[in-house]
Amino acid sequence: MTFDEVRKFALLWDEVEDGTSYGTPALKVRKKLLARLREDNDSLVMFGVPQDEREMLIEGQSKIYYFTDHYRDYPIVLIRLSNAKRAIVEPLLRRHWRTLASKKVVKEFDES
């Protein structure tokens, strides 16, 4: 999977838009970061993943999930896109989208 593929499906969701963060491509919802591409052009910085869940993900699939010391104290997991499939990325991205999108948009999504 590539960031462009992630971008294509995420931009179909209401309130998602292209942006940049730390000089890299990013996806934003109402000006808040949904996810961004790391400088290595292969890792997705996935926000909204609690540390205990991150540990479980890494333990179960270390070829896909990882983190660096920089992210140790944050609810973030890194996803190696070259090893990931949409079925891995989309649920985490959608969950974080739900926390950033307006209540109205989330309600409309749930009702559709």
Regions found by a protein language model. Name each.
Residues 1-112:
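Charge-dense, helix-prone N-terminal extensions
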